[in-house]
A protein has these predicted regions:
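Class I S-adenosyl-L-methionine-dependent methyltransferase catalytic core
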Residues: 1-187
Length: 187
């Protein structure tokens, strides 16, 4: 596994020897980050269920400003920290050894992040719970969900299929424009 594009293109990433970890395939990662290209410059990124950190690190390679990673599995955390160290990005990353559900649930500020990647184990329904929370708070302007083809998500996202992997991208609604009104003269 390696970084596909950007300033670290071709750099290898460490991956844990754990059958429960399914890193996002390079071609899927490349396609998704290409779709997000206009959103990446100076973006703050959240990588939930981060695993190796490949999605967040790819975003940094392509111009994101900072990335936070949330992961609980020891083997994945070890690989993630090794990848952060190898790319020398400790100054613009934070690694949280936390459960992603309560972490995301604690995010109450709209737009706390520009982009959120969410890639929980396919067999779980944790993604549904994170999306429910995101739909209430919109803690990221763009929410990227990776899931199995048979996992139906709420409407409102744009769905992209890559074989046995589906990526659905949601965008937070833009706040209404406030148009200043001219003051009316008093009589």
């Amino acid at each position: 596994m390696r970084i596909v594009r950007g300033k670290w293109a071709g750099r290898d990433l460490t991956s844990p020897n754990d059958f429960r970890v399914h890193p996002t395939a390079e071609r899927v990662r490349a396609a998704v980050l290409d779709l997000l290209s206009p959103d990446l410059k100076n973006a703050s990124v959240l990588d939930l269920f981060a695993g190796t950190g490949a999605l967040g690190l790819e975003a940094l390679s392509r111009g994101a400003k900072r990335a936070d990673f949330v992961e609980t599995r020891p083997a994945s955390l070890h690989a993630l920290k090794a990848n952060v160290a190898a790319l020398r990005v400790r100054d613009c990353t934070r690694v949280f050894k936390r459960d992603a559900l309560p972490f995301a649930g604690a995010l109450t500020t709209a737009g706390a992040y520009d982009i959120c990647f969410c890639d929980p184990p396919y067999e779980s329904r944790m993604l549904d719970r994170v999306i429910e929370g995101w739909q209430v708070t919109h803690f990221a302007r763009v929410f990227v969900a990776e899931h199995a083809p048979g996992h139906e998500l709420p409407r409102g996202g744009k769905r992209f299929e890559y074989g046995e992997t589906v990526v659905t991208i949601y965008r937070a609604p833009k706040p209404p424009k406030v148009v200043p009104t001219e003051p009316t003269p008093s009589a």
